[in-house]
Design a protein with these regions (language model features):
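N-terminal loops that bind phosphate or other acidic moieties
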Residues: 1-137
Length: 137
């Protein structure tokens, strides 16, 4: 949320729209021009999918010359998620839960996630083409 507030304050009217996904109970109030969604963390849930679909909708119709500012802070890898076709949310959640219970660290978890996700491993950047995308983590 702090990233989003800072970006909104610094960029002002240059921001034409956007969305933030945060953990339940962490929205911290409205940000001008930005939609705020709360979703499951560390396990993705139906709100995770809804929020991710909204971001894909916003970014999927941008023309060349536009820019996507993609800000990711702690927890972002579970909050921005859409399973690959053929993989259910339930299966993804079960896999994630098993990894967490098995003691996987965040690097190991994210390595597996990128192979199961429609938005990780460069897939979100491809989705955003032909726009420029700037990611800050």
């Amino acid at each position: 949320m702090d990233y989003g507030k800072a970006a909104s304050e610094k960029l002002g009217a240059r921001i034409r729209g956007g969305a933030i996904i945060t953990k339940y109970g962490h929205s911290g109030g409205p940000i001008r021009g930005i939609e705020i969604y709360e979703a499951g963390h560390p396990l993705p849930d139906s709100e995770t999918l809804r929020a991710t679909e909204r971001i894909l909708g916003i970014t999927g119709s941008l023309e060349a010359g536009r820019m996507v500012l993609f800000l990711v802070s702690g927890g972002g890898s579970s909050l921005f998620e859409k399973p690959l076709p053929g993989l259910s949310l339930q299966s993804l959640t079960e896999i994630t839960s098993a990894l967490l219970l098995g003691g996987a660290d965040i690097s190991e978890l994210n390595t597996v996630r990128k192979h199961l996700s429609s938005v990780k491993g460069g897939r979100f950047a491809l989705h955003c083409m032909p726009t420029e995308i700037f990611q800050i983590t």
